[in-house]
Amino acid sequence: MSIDSLKGQLPDFAKDVRLNLGSIANDDSLKEQTKYGLLLACALASRNAEVAAAFDREAASHLTPEARDAARAAATIMGMNNVYYRFVHLASNPVYKTMPAKLRMGVIGSPGVPKTDFELWCLAVSAINGCGMCIDAHEKVLADAGVTQEVIQTAVRFAAIVQSAAIALEAAQLPAFA
């Protein structure tokens, strides 16, 4: 399945999602690896097998095996970090902020792709997963590395569109009213 076939599966109530998917498919504001790694990481974070398969297939001709693994690692490591750091951020007890995380996350230091690509993918996944602490941390790293606010906003926009496609597919599976 590709982005085009994914668009074809979306019902009429998701027309805006279909149009937005077309927009990101044609968007060339990001470098190829940055864009397709971002889309794959976000698709995996959506936890929808059809969306993940569509974006994995779409990314196949645009990513090296190392970049594909890095995108998968971004979704995976943020799946862990977003839960932990969202808890730390939201818990009323300030003691949790002082405790060591004791979580292995070596891939962040050595992702196998340029640091800014990986950080952008982590930021987008963190937006999907709703971790404000991680969003702030990754946004700061990106800003300090000279990544523009427009690029950061584009990544989060792409994340929102991918997530909405997953929700639309799931909503379409609800049985019809009798």
UniProtKB/Swiss-Prot annotation:
Reaction equation(s) it catalyzes: N(6)-[(R)-dihydrolipoyl]-L-lysyl-[lipoyl-carrier protein] + a hydroperoxide = N(6)-[(R)-lipoyl]-L-lysyl-[lipoyl-carrier protein] + an alcohol + H2O
E.C. number: 1.11.1.28
Keyword set, alphabetical order: Antioxidant, Disulfide bond, Oxidoreductase, Peroxidase, Redox-active center
PANTHER family: ALKYL HYDROPEROXIDE REDUCTASE AHPD
Disulphide connectivity of cysteines: C131-C134
A Gene Ontology biological process term: cell redox homeostasis
Protein name per UniProt: Alkyl hydroperoxide reductase AhpD
Coiled-coil spans in chain: none
SUPFAM superfamilies, A to Z: AhpD-like
Family of the protein in this entry: Belongs to the AhpD family.
Gene3D superfamilies in the cross-refs: AhpD-like (1.20.1290.10)
